[in-house]
């Protein structure tokens, strides 16, 4: 599908859908708990469905009633899946599921779409082997398809976390192992996502300790208890509308966002305020009004998912903006550094690549035919660019939005946006 976008005056109020990070973690934890859990306001997207499918394969049941999941969890001993588990496009579901598979007394095989079959999982595979499981990639290239055999027991491993999902997988599953686990971290990107995982462990009474996130100690023999929760809004999805308001000099009100939540992408609000946007907070409502933005250097390591949207914001900021220290952005669904450089160039941006980021100078953008590369964040970021430049912008692979924000087009239209799926 294609997304056709024209310059629009956007203002009004948008309710942000549930957090993907919280939704998928809650789905896995409900499955690992013995008993019935209730998850309200989950994200309903293809990524979340992938998480449900992974957990169902291990023996839990998931029923969606009135936009809430009722989960009957399998507990600490997942069953052997009846078939290969296809995670679709969900890297989170794959990586969290790998260590869950190491709890199984038998074999589990994971695969996914063409993007998943290129994404790195080597360090996590190595860690599973070190903790007493058996794991290997079928092509020997550190990417899915991957075979896991449990049951892991615990022990010591080093872990190179080019993505925080490796550590989250270990943290969520090792409390259920027989022995204690000691993880030494050699590199850790995206720390706020680990903080979300630790928030869940705290909520469910799991014991652990860490040394400034350089070493983690997780006692074995623990159990998850069933729980009820309400998923907060997704700051990563809200980023597109934060940028939209900041560059348009109009006001948007974003609702269903909890500033006390550990999601890292709420930092985008402070960044945009520092660049010149006007931000006001009223309980769970955030008012954003654009003013003249000024370029600056921004360390994106903790908020890599915001890179595509911030690249668009930088095109409208006076002077030069440098988005730096985010090499892991090259390892997402696409190489987001390269892709945003190439597609914004088509729209007239003065932009160049760094090994770990982008350099962007104020630019006068124009509409163009651009590629979305089957990447939800690329598609939606280019749509925001198209809403704020002359001419018509057409973006391919628009169906990728369903990964995290199926209602994106409706949200834009509700505030006056000229946007259409064709």
UniProtKB/Swiss-Prot annotation:
Q: Which GO terms describe its molecular function?
A: 3-phosphoshikimate 1-carboxyvinyltransferase activity
Q: Which SUPFAM superfamilies match?
A: EPT/RTPC-like
Q: From its record, what is one biological process in GO terms?
A: chorismate biosynthetic process
Q: Which UniProt keywords apply?
A: Amino-acid biosynthesis, Aromatic amino acid biosynthesis, Cytoplasm, Transferase
Q: Where does 3-phosphoshikimate bind?
A: 20-21, 25, 163-165, 305, 328, 332
Q: Does the keyword Transferase apply?
A: yes
User: Which pathway is this protein engaged in?
Assistant: Metabolic intermediate biosynthesis; chorismate biosynthesis; chorismate from D-erythrose 4-phosphate and phosphoenolpyruvate: step 6/7
Q: Which domain of life is it from?
A: Bacteria
Among InterPro entries, the record links this protein to: Enolpyruvate_Tfrase_dom, Enolpyruvate_Tfrase_sf, EPSP_synthase, EPSP_synthase_CS, RNA3'P_cycl/enolpyr_Trfase_a/b
Q: Which residues bind phosphoenolpyruvate?
A: 20, 91, 119, 165, 336, 377
Q: Where does this protein reside within or beyond the cell?
A: Cytoplasm
Q: Which catalytic residues are annotated?
A: 305 (proton acceptor)
Q: Which GO terms describe its cellular component?
A: cytoplasm
Q: What is its EC number?
A: 2.5.1.19
Does the record carry Magnesium as a key word? no
Catalyzed reaction equations: 3-phosphoshikimate + phosphoenolpyruvate = 5-O-(1-carboxyvinyl)-3-phosphoshikimate + phosphate
Matching PANTHER family, A to Z?
A: AROM/DEHYDROQUINATE SYNTHASE, PENTAFUNCTIONAL AROM POLYPEPTIDE
Q: Which family does it belong to?
A: Belongs to the EPSP synthase family.
Q: What does this protein do?
A: Catalyzes the transfer of the enolpyruvyl moiety of phosphoenolpyruvate (PEP) to the 5-hydroxyl of shikimate-3-phosphate (S3P) to produce enolpyruvyl shikimate-3-phosphate and inorganic phosphate.
**Assembly, per entry:** Monomer.
List the protein's name: 3-phosphoshikimate 1-carboxyvinyltransferase
Query: Which species is listed as the source?
Result: Ruminiclostridium cellulolyticum (strain ATCC 35319 / DSM 5812 / JCM 6584 / H10)
Q: What is the lineage of its organism?
A: Bacteria, Bacillati, Bacillota, Clostridia, Eubacteriales
Q: State the gene name recorded for this protein.
A: aroA
């Amino acid at each position: 599908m294609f997304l056709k976008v024209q310059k629009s005056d956007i203002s009004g109020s948008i309710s942000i859908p549930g957090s993907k990070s919280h939704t998928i973690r809650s789905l896995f934890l409900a499955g690992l708990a013995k008993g019935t859990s209730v998850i309200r306001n989950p994200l309903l997207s293809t990524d979340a469905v992938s998480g449900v499918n992974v957990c169902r394969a291990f023996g839990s049941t998931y029923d969606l009633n009135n936009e809430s999941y009722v989960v009957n969890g399998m507990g600490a001993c997942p069953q052997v899946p009846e078939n290969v588990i296809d995670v679709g496009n969900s890297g989170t579901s794959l990586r969290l599921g790998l260590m869950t598979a190491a709890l199984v007394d038998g074999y589990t095989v994971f695969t996914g779409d063409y993007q998943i079959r290129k994404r790195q999982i080597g360090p996590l595979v190595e860690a599973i082997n070190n903790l007493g499981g058996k794991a290997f990639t079928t092509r020997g290239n550190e990417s899915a398809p991957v075979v896991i055999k449990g049951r892991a027991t615990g022990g010591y491993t080093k872990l190179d976390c080019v993505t925080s999902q490796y550590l989250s997988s270990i943290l969520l599953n090792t409390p259920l192992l027989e022995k204690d686990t000691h993880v030494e971290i050699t590199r850790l990107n995206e720390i706020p996502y680990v903080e979300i995982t630790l928030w869940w462990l705290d909520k469910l009474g799991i014991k652990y300790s860490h040394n400034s996130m350089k070493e983690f100690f997780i006692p074995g023999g623990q159990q998850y208890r069933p729980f009820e929760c309400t998923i907060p809004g997704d700051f990563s999805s809200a980023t597109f509308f934060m940028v939209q308001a900041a560059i348009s000099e109009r006001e948007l009100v974003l609702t269903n966002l909890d500033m006390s939540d550990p999601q890292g992408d709420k930092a985008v609000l402070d960044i945009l305020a520092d660049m010149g946007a006007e931000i006001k907070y009223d309980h769970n409502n955030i008012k954003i009004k654009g003013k003249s933005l000024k370029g600056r250097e921004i360390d994106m390591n903790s908020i890599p998912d915001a890179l595509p949207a911030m690249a668009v914001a930088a095109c409208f900021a006076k002077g030069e903006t440098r988005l730096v220290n985010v090499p892991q952005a090259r390892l997402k669904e696409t190489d987001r550094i390269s892709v945003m450089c190439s597609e914004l160039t088509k729209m007239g941006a003065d932009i160049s690549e760094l090994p770990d980021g982008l350099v962007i100078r104020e630019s006068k953008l124009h509409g163009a035919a651009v590629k979305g590369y089957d990447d939800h964040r690329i598609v939606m970021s280019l749509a925001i660019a198209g809403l704020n430049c002359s001419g018509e912008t057409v973006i391919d692979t628009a169906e990728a939005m369903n990964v995290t924000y199926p209602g994106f087009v409706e949200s834009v239209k509700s505030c006056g946006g000229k946007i259409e799926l064709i």
